[in-house]
Amino acid sequence: LFSRRLMDAAGGPERMEYNGSQDYELFLRLTEKARKIVHIPHALYYWRSSPGSTASDISAKTYCIDAGIAALKAHYARCGVAVDDVSLIPGTPGYYKTDYTIDHPGRVSILIPTCDHIRDLETCVESIYARTTYPDLEIILIENNSKAPETFRAYERMQKEHPDTLKVVTWEGKGFNYSALNNFGEKFATGEYLLLLNNDTEVITAAWLEEMVMYAQQKRVGCVGAKLLYPDDTIQHAGVGFGIGGVAGHLHKYFPATSDGYMGRLNYVQDVYADTAACLLIRKEIYDEVGGLDESYAVAFNDVDFCVRVREAGHTNVFTPFAQLYHYESKSRGLDESPAKRKRFESEVKRFQQRWAKQLAAGDPCLNPNFDLMKEDFTFDIKPLE
């Protein structure tokens, strides 16, 4: 629903040169002029799609795809947004991938906290150098109380192999504090962008950094998260839903890597409330603006807390499925199973809920309120209209 005044301001009704996607083209023009877009999160009516209609499968009318791409390119041109390409996302008819022009491929400083488990770290670092196509990066290994002699021999070898792009800095703190480690490592970063990365990850897609930087460079964007897979090729991270389980949860967790997800959400870039810091890219200036990670969250929820603060500062967080890595989660630290770890976790949950009570009550604008917030799989929990 929109006003006649808005349609006139946007240049009039549907244009038939975009036949097949003429409504899409109109909506793009409307968004350029609208002050705000409002979505009513209730099932107000049902839409029946017939076989062969674009509502059921746009591939039934391929000319619609070409018209949609043309409409989107025209939209970018009117808005002054530089793009290299717009293409249909394979297997997801009606969804398009935009390759934004990277105006300036600024240096990415990759911060990797690490403590022994040198084989995991070697896999991570070797995959970065062997598979990454991004032209300017540095790796900062944040040494955290390692004991094994082979760890330090590996550090020396890595620095000799990559003298210009890899350095090791030693954190003098005790125990494990992911926030403090990254805040310490950030002091040594020379890049325009910071990439927080766990040492138990492995790069899959060569253009992973290009895919993340093309969004992180945009003024409106804060954090950018990647698609992370478990070793069995199921989803570990595809964006974080705010309020799931009373705090936050990973959307589509344990879905097969090949799944389209709910409404194709595993196939396209989208705004999300938060991302995991296991692989998180952000401009260094924003990291400094919000004060880095909160060191009172040693292990859990430091990333979600950070993302909330980035949102409160006026930025949008993004998930892209086109940057993919394996994440051998918690291998290097162990799971929170001991009584002490459970107590620490429960304390962090309580503190998080108290700090962000207002935001939790308001809900996640990237999730329809008709989803069951006790689950991460987009199960419906339809609320009747009163």
Residue ranges and their predicted role:
Residues 1-5, 17-19, 177-180, 187, ...:
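A recurrent flexible, glycine/aromatic-enriched loop bordering the glycosyltransferase active site
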Residues 18, 28-47, 70-89, 287, ...:
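Catalytic donor-sugar/metal-binding loop of nucleotide-sugar-dependent glycosyltransferases
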Residues 117-132:
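Short, well-formed alpha-helical segments that are part of the catalytic scaffolds
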Residues 129-174:
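Acidic donor-binding segment of Leloir-type glycosyltransferases
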Residues 201-247:
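Conserved donor NDP-sugar-binding/catalytic core segment of glycosyltransferases
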